[in-house]
Every structure is written in structure tokens, then in C-alpha cells.
């Protein structure tokens, strides 16, 4: 969905917005242009057409190629951990984002108008919003899974179905919360002659409650849950790292403390937590400007200037960047935490007591938590 949702007409001076409060039919024309200081800048879909097409094509290629590499990498793994399962789910979501959201936007920017039938308009908008929710809720599921892995490790090992249940819930909520999109959006003719797949509001005032609800469901509530989960995880790791020093000091070299094996955290799990946190930070960096701009814009807190219109064009493409960045993060972390067995055997004789202890812990886990 575009960052700038304004559809009302501006007066000639560009100082205010004149809205018709009476209900309109789905086919009524509306203005879809920005007027800044008396100059018309055109619609979002025609402005900076070449620049937007180049940007979207680059994002599309990086998204599809990058996530294809991730999916191939996880498919080749003989031992698939729960972390690998979530990485796969995230890559699938990002791949569909590239095919449905980015590729559709490329076609839309190229034609300028929406040339498909009204039904296609509604379905495309619905799928775009589904992926919007899913990309966030998969991260929420990942944070809950990491919380159980660190805080309740023994229950975590016994609950193999939890990961799949979390993903099913994430996708189910995504499809459910996106249903209003089928009613809200439709194909309509704008007053400047363009035909767009746009909201069928009677006037712009409906955008404010709609975008507020979407922002909370897609961003603020999930981000709160994620922050709480990882806050507890980081605190647990810090406490157990202190316990580690006490346990090691009471163990003579060559012995393994069973209490350590049961209670402390492997390097692989900590690496997985670091990967997860970086993924979350990338999500925040790409999506925060989008929702912040939309909220300020819909509450009329931004000036009607040329700069605001330029910002809306740039910010609109930031969410797509998230799907292109995630595979790069995976590649960085996977190369640093995946060790061939041959190298482990050659280094076995040079292992310290701490390294032998951690290796023993990994052997007693039914599914080691590496990416």
C-alpha cells in the first residue's frame, strides 16, 4: 500500500484539503494528485517512474535470488533444527513478497494505470496485505520459539510440534486480518483520468482509523511482543552466563558437570539468538519510517510540501528492502556458525575443557539449534 494515502482534492493555493462528506459510488472520480505551492506534481504511480522501476527491479532480483539461496541451503541440510524451520518460513514469506508485492508494483509503475479487472484488484490487494501481516507474525513466532528455547530448554526439546503450531497461527491470523481489504479496495477512475486499484472510502477521514488499526496489528503490538520475548531471553542468557563461571570453577579439568549440561546455553543457541535479533533490527529499520510517516500524514501532522511528496515516494519502497536484506543476514551468520564435521575432528585434540563441555552438551540435544 502506498505510503501517501491522500485522495482528497487540494485547493489551488495548496494550503488545505477540500473533502466532500457525502457518500460516493465506487465509480466516482477522485483526485489523486499532489498540488504543492500551486504546482501539480502528478500521481504517485507516474512520479519518478524510471527511478522507481530501477529500484524495484533491483529489490526484486535481490529478494528472489537471495531467498532462493536460503531455501536451497536449508533444503540441503540433513539435520533440520527448529531454527532452520523458521529461517525457511521467513524465506518463503520474503519470496512471496517479491513475487506478489514487488513484481506487482513493478507492473503497476510501468503501466501507470491498473489495467486488470476489479476482482484482480481486490485479490492482489488482499494477498499483499496477507504478506504484510505474515512477514511480521513469522518474526513474532520466531521470538516466542527462541523464548522457549532459552528460558524453558527441557520443555522446548519435548515440544517438537510447537514451531509448526506457531507458524499455522501466524498465517491464519494474517489471512483473517486481511479480509477487510477485499471490501475496502476496488478498481476506480480518478479525476485526473487514471484508473487505479484504490480504497473505496467516501472521504479521506476513513484512512486515519484504518491505518491506525493496521499499524497496531502489523507493527506496534508485534514489536511489543518481540521486545518482551527477547528482553527475557537476553536477561536469561546473562544470568546463566554468570552461573557458568561458578559451575566451571567447581569442575576439575576433564570432567563434565551434569548441572551445566542441563542448565546452560550452547554457543549455537546464542548464535541463533544473535541472528534473530539482527533480523528484528532490520525489520524495525525498514518498517519504522513507513508506519511513522503514514501515521503523521493521516493525522495531518506533515506540511503539504514538495519534500513530503518526495519522502512518500522513497519511504514507500523501504518495506520491500526488508525482504532483500534478510537473506544477506542469513548468509553472514550461516557461514560463521556452520562447521564441517571434518574440521571438528581435526580440532578435537586441541579442544579446551570449555569447548569439550559445550560439544558434549550439543551431543545430548535431540536437535542442535544451529542455523
Swiss-Prot record:
Molecular functions per Gene Ontology: neuropeptide receptor activity; vasopressin receptor activity
Disulfide bonding pattern of the chain: 121-197
Extracellular side: 1-52, 104-123, 186-212, 297-312
Record-annotated membrane-spanning stretches: 53-73, 83-103, 124-144, 165-185, 213-233, 276-296, 313-333
CDD domains given in the database record: 7tmA_NPSR
Domain of life from the UniProt record: Eukaryota
Gene3D superfamilies in the record: Rhodopsin 7-helix transmembrane proteins
Keyword entries, A-Z: Asthma, Cell membrane, Cytoplasm, Disulfide bond, G-protein coupled receptor, Glycoprotein, Membrane, Receptor, Transducer, Transmembrane, Transmembrane helix
GO biological process, one term: positive regulation of ERK1 and ERK2 cascade
Gene Ontology CC entries for this record: cytoplasm; plasma membrane
Tissue distribution: Isoform 4 is ubiquitous; it is detected in glandular epithelia of bronchus, stomach, small intestine, colon, uterus, esophagus, spleen, kidney, pancreas, prostate and breast. Isoform 1 is detected in uterus, colon and prostate, and in the smooth muscle cell layer in bronchial and arterial walls (at protein level). Isoform 1 is predominantly expressed in smooth muscle. Isoform 4 is predominantly expressed in epithelial cells.
SUPFAM superfamilies: Family A G protein-coupled receptor-like
Chain positions carrying an annotated carbohydrate: 4
Pfam families reported in the protein's UniProt record: 7tm_1 (PF00001)
Alphabetized InterPro entries for the sequence: GPCR_Rhodpsn, GPCR_Rhodpsn_7TM, NPS_rcpt, Vasoprsn_rcpt
Region annotated Disordered, chain positions: 1-22
Compositionally biased tracts (Polar residues): 1-21
Membrane-side (Cytoplasmic) residue stretches: 74-82, 145-164, 234-275, 334-371
Annotated function: G-protein coupled receptor for neuropeptide S (NPS). Promotes mobilization of intracellular Ca(2+) stores. Inhibits cell growth in response to NPS binding. Involved in pathogenesis of asthma and other IgE-mediated diseases.
Family stated for the protein in its record: Belongs to the G-protein coupled receptor 1 family. Vasopressin/oxytocin receptor subfamily.
Note: Only isoforms with 7 transmembrane topology (isoform 1, isoform 3 and isoform 4) are transported into the plasma membrane in transfected cells, while the truncated ones retain intracellular compartments.
Disease cited in the entry: Asthma-related traits 2: Asthma-related traits include clinical symptoms of asthma, such as coughing, wheezing, dyspnea, bronchial hyperresponsiveness as assessed by methacholine challenge test, serum IgE levels, atopy and atopic dermatitis.
Protein name per the record: Neuropeptide S receptor
Amino acid at each position: 500500500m502506498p505510503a501517501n494515502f491522500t485522495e482528497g482534492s487540494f485547493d489551488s493555493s495548496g494550503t488545505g484539503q477540500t473533502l466532500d462528506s457525502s457518500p460516493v459510488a465506487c465509480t466516482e472520480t477522485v483526485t489523486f494528485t499532489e498540488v504543492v505551492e500551486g504546482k501539480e506534481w502528478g500521481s504517485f504511480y507516474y512520479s519518478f517512474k524510471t527511478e522507481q522501476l530501477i529500484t524495484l527491479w533491483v529489490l526484486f532480483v535481490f529478494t528472489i535470488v537471495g531467498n532462493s539461496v536460503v531455501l536451497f541451503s536449508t533444503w540441503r541440510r540433513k539435520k533440520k533444527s527448529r531454527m532452520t524451520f523458521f529461517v525457511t518460513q521467513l524465506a518463503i514469506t520474503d519470496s512471496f513478497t517479491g513475487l506478489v508485492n514487488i513484481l506487482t508494483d513493478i507492473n503497476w509503475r510501468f503501466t501507470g494505470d491498473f489495467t486488470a479487472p476489479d476482482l484482480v484488484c481486490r485479490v492482489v490487494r488482499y494477498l499483499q496485505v496477507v504478506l504484510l501481516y505474515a512477514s511480521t507474525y513469522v518474526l513474532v513466532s520466531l521470538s516466542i520459539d527462541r523464548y522457549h528455547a532459552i528460558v524453558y530448554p527441557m520443555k522446548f526439546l519435548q515440544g517438537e510440534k510447537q514451531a509448526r503450531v506457531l507458524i499455522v497461527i501466524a498465517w491464519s491470523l494474517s489471512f483473517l486480518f486481511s479480509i477487510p481489504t477485499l471490501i475496502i479496495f476496488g478498481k476506480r477512475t480518478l479525476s485526473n483520468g487514471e484508473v487505479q486499484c484504490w480504497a473505496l472510502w467516501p472521504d479521506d477521514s476513513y484512512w486515519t482509523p484504518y491505518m491506525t488499526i493496521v499499524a497496531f496489528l502489523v507493527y506496534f503490538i508485534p514489536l511489543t511482543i518481540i521486545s518482551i520475548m527477547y528482553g527475557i531471553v537476553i536477561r536469561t542468557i546473562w544470568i546463566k552466563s554468570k552461573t557458568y563461571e561458578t559451575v566451571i570453577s567447581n569442575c576439575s579439568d576433564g570432567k563434565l558437570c551434569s548441572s551445566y549440561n542441563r542448565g546452560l546455553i550452547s554457543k549455537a543457541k546464542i548464535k541463533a539468538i544473535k541472528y534473530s535479533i539482527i533480523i528484528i533490527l532490520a525489520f524495525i529499520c525498514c518498517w519504522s519510517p513507513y508506519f511513522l510517516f503514514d501515521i503523521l500524514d493521516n493525522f495531518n501532522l506533515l506540511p503539504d510540501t514538495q519534500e513530503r511528496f518526495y519522502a512518500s515516494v522513497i519511504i514507500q519502497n523501504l518495506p520491500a528492502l526488508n525482504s532483500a536484506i534478510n537473506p544477506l543476514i542469513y548468509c553472514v551468520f550461516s557461514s560463521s556458525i556452520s562447521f564441517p564435521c571434518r574440521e571438528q575432528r581435526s580440532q578435537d585434540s586441541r579442544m579446551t575443557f570449555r569447548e569439550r563441555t559445550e560439544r558434549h552438551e550439543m551431543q545430548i540435544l535431540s536437535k542442535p539449534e544451529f542455523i
